[in-house]
């Protein structure tokens, strides 16, 4: 059984630490900074870092990769279509990778970057998703490289995963995302309740993650483009009717970019 903990980095990044407590082996996801991982390993000298998983090429996700590989000899697994430092295993849609005895399916989710991938395991005991900067808690990443035609289907695909799937995204953006979700759906009681819950967590300096796919379906406007009120708000923002899920998504994303 794998334990998952967050190692905070920079101002709002999370490096996810996967731990096989029986074998004292661990892996990390998107180590943008080596220092938090180095500190953990120094405090736990009996542990071995075996794998580094990377979702995309942005420096706040890969900045610590080469240092950690040099220190530990860990295998670096990342997207085939992006330049990932120290990469040993190039991964693309449909590939599978075994990490700490867990098999992860690789999902291509372009949009934030063109080669962005996510890692999904259906368990046991619980399905987990490492979504990088594609799906956030109550939000999604900006489209730095991709298009709405790429990103909306990618998000819809993640939304179709089992509702109990735990979502481990890479940033603590939940509260600001929920402020936007409240503007899009002011009458959504699930959004309001989540906003209150996350406000309490952050006031106590506690993290708001993981989320679940089920919770995202209820509260994430970027997964709710078929909802009448969401479409109406997107139409108001653009000043015309958006006639497809992609168009509604594009309107929401452009609104959020300036929110």
UniProtKB/Swiss-Prot annotation:
Pathway: Secondary metabolite metabolism; methylglyoxal degradation; (R)-lactate from methylglyoxal: step 2/2. InterPro entries: Clx_II_MBL (IPR035680), Glyoxalase_II_hydrolase (IPR050110), HAGH_C (IPR032282), Hydroxyacylglutathione_Hdrlase (IPR017782), Metallo-B-lactamas (IPR001279), RibonucZ/Hydroxyglut_hydro (IPR036866). Gene3D superfamilies: Ribonuclease Z/Hydroxyacylglutathione hydrolase-like (3.60.15.10). Zn(2+) 1 binds at residues 56, 58, 112, 133. It catalyses: an S-(2-hydroxyacyl)glutathione + H2O = a 2-hydroxy carboxylate + glutathione + H(+). The lineage of its organism: Bacteria, Pseudomonadati, Pseudomonadota, Gammaproteobacteria, Pseudomonadales. HAMAP family: Glyoxalase_2. Thiolesterase that catalyzes the hydrolysis of S-D-lactoyl-glutathione to form glutathione and D-lactic acid. The keyword Transmembrane helix does not apply. Zn(2+) 2 binds at residues 60-61, 133, 171. It comes from Pseudomonas putida (strain GB-1). The keyword Metal-binding applies. The gene is gloB. Belongs to the metallo-beta-lactamase superfamily. Glyoxalase II family. Binds 2 Zn(2+) ions per subunit. Its EC number is 3.1.2.6. SMART domains: Lactamase_B. Pfam families: HAGH_C, Lactamase_B. Monomer. Keywords: Hydrolase, Metal-binding, Zinc. Its cofactor is Zn(2+). This is Hydroxyacylglutathione hydrolase. GO terms for biological process: methylglyoxal catabolic process to D-lactate via S-lactoyl-glutathione.
């Amino acid at each position: 059984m794998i334990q998952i903990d967050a190692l905070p980095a920079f101002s709002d990044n999370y490096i996810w630490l996967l731990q096989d407590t029986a074998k004292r082996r661990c892996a990390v996801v998107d180590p943008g900074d080596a220092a938090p991982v180095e500190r953990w390993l120094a405090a736990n000298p009996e542990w071995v870092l075996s794998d580094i998983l990377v979702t995309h090429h942005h420096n706040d996700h890969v900045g610590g990769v080469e240092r950690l590989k040099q220190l530990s000899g860990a295998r670096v697994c990342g997207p085939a279509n992006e330049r990932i430092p120290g990469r040993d295993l190039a991964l693309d849609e449909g590939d599978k990778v075994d990490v700490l005895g867990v098999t992860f399916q690789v999902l291509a989710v372009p949009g934030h970057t063109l080669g962005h991938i996510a890692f999904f395991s259906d368990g046991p005991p619980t399905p987990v998703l490492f979504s990088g900067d594609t799906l956030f808690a109550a939000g999604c990443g900006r489209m730095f490289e991709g298009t709405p035609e790429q990103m909306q289907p990618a998000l819809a695909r993640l939304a179709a995963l089992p509702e109990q799937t735990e979502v481990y995204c890479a940033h603590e953006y939940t509260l600001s995302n929920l402020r936007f979700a409240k503007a899009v759906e002011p009458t959504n009681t699930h959004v309001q309740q989540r906003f209150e819950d996350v406000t309490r967590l952050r006031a106590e300096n506690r993290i708001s993650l993981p989320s679940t796919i089920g919770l995202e379906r209820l509260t994430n406007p970027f997964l709710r483009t078929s909802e009448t009120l969401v479409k109406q708000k997107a139409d108001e923002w653009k000043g015309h009717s958006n006639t497809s899920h992609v168009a509604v998504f594009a309107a929401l994303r452009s609104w959020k970019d300036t929110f």
